[in-house]
Amino acid sequence: MAGDQLNVLNALDVAKTQWYHFTAIIIAGMGFFTDAYDLFCISLVTKLLGRIYYHVDGSEKPGTLPPNVSAAVNGVAFCGTLAGQLFFGWLGDKLGRKKVYGMTLMVMVLCSIASGLSFGSNPKTVMTTLCFFRFWLGFGIGGDYPLSATIMSEYANKKTRGAFIAAVFAMQGFGILTGGIFAIIVSAAFEAKFPAPTYQIDALASTVPQADYVWRIILMVGALPAAMTYYSRSKMPETARYTALVAKDAKLAASNMSKVLQVEIEAEQQGTEDKSNSFGLFSKEFMKRHGLHLLGTTSTWFLLDIAFYSQNLFQKDIFSAIGWIPPAQTMNAIQEVFKIARAQTLIALCSTVPGYWFTVAFIDVIGRFAIQMMGFFFMTVFMFALAIPYDHWTHKENRIGFVAMYSLTFFFANFGPNATTFVVPAEIFPARFRSTCHGISAASGKLGAMVGAFGFLYLAQSPDKTKTEHGYPPGIGVKNSLIVLGVVNLLGMVFTLLVPESKGKSLEEMSGENEQNDESSSSSNNNSNNAVSTA
């Protein structure tokens, strides 16, 4: 890479934080807001789907989704997300970030609406169409991971880059929060308009016909924030790093950045390509330079998501233990949606959202490595603290302590590896592979999410087949599952050692794209500082 290319990039690295940086955070962050809303809102309505479509006359308890149907409805979006992360990650490097960025939103908008319009003459066909549209919804969501992270990293200055990328990711917390609040509003409105007896009083009447609209409305509203952001995304210029380093047009890169950032960049003639940086993805040279880095980002994200998505194992027990969700038969269908949404909203407000924003505040102060290592460490400690004396926590008088431990575990997931595993892959790989490698890392994480959400759902079943949930085979029990999760977090600490610290360093320094041009880089940096000071 030549000095004239470095000129525009160094100007971005030293540019002061300005309004367009925050605009980019909002534009990219609204995608993640939508992602979180769409992925998490399904958990608010699965109980309702069971009552509506799988009611059994004469049963003591309301209908529930069979294990295979529940796994499909909850997990199919993860499968789509994994595929979308790989495909759009690759496409973002092939065609450019800007060209692909709007596609993901359109897929999300169309499939959010279509999910709420799922149709069929019997439960099987309704669930099939719902799963079909949620797969493609996940496909669009998956594309947002590598593209949003890459775009934000390539726009940001090196001083606050970590906070900017983490802020985009932190919008997930608000998406979860909004999903819960909206479900509370919708269910409260329907309960007021269409009151119904509890299940134990009148099983059939406890689910009013209008309840079928509740889950559809909640799913469809996910299209709104994505649709509102589409125009803004279409107006974002291509990132300077893609234009200069991949498209090899430093002049256009300088022109594009001068339009949106208050930085004076002299448009110089096109530089020559550095042959030492022309190796391909997964080539011998790539593996030599970045092989361990990619192993580090994929393994830590995989291990983190196993633990993070295993929270489904304990939520229902925790909510019931502290009285947030009473037994299902003591509520009607819409009341159950209200109680579940209220519980999830409180968890998001007290644990999830603060953890995200602690990362935003401290990531450029103490660094990515320290936050990730600290997060895995405390997750390990709290998982073992829950597991080893598990029988102690099952006593009613000790359950508040269990809830506190549980909340701290996921606070340190968010003020820890859940955020840093998203940030780091967008910083340490060359520009021409950045989106692809982030997509690979994210897809590895989503594979871990499937293991955590569904593998452990089976694994955590009681070894005594008479005590397993309906339709599930015997497992190893919750205590042993917690021990396994503690070991998973411990492995996360080990693999974090493969991930380099990127705090305060330029993307080109981290990726090695300027290692042959130290002198020209230094010269260009001086020029850039002069340009910025006059801007």
Swiss-Prot record:
It is a multi-pass membrane protein. Mature pollen. GO terms for biological process: arsenate ion transmembrane transport; phosphate ion transport. One of its GO terms (molecular function) is symporter activity. The modification Phosphoserine is found at residue 520. Residues 506-535 are annotated as: Disordered. Keywords: Membrane, Phosphate transport, Phosphoprotein, Symport, Transmembrane, Transmembrane helix, Transport. It holds the Pfam family Sugar_tr. Residues 1-24, 92-99, 153-161, 233-289, 367-368, 421-438, 502-535 are cytoplasmic. InterPro entries: MFS_dom, MFS_sugar_transport-like, MFS_trans_sf, Phos_permease. It is found in: Membrane. Its main location: membrane. Residues 519-535 have a biased composition (Low complexity). Residues 46-70, 121-131, 183-211, 311-345, 390-399, 460-480 are extracellular. The chain crosses the membrane at residues 25-45, 71-91, 100-120, 132-152, 162-182, 212-232, 290-310, 346-366, 369-389, 400-420, 439-459, 481-501. CDD domains: MFS_PhT. Induction: Slightly induced in roots during phosphate starvation. One of its GO terms (cellular component) is plasma membrane. Belongs to the major facilitator superfamily. Phosphate:H(+) symporter (TC 2.A.1.9) family. Although related to the sugar transporter family, it does not transport sugars. High-affinity transporter for external inorganic phosphate. This is Probable inorganic phosphate transporter 1-7. It comes from Arabidopsis thaliana (Mouse-ear cress). The gene is PHT1-7.
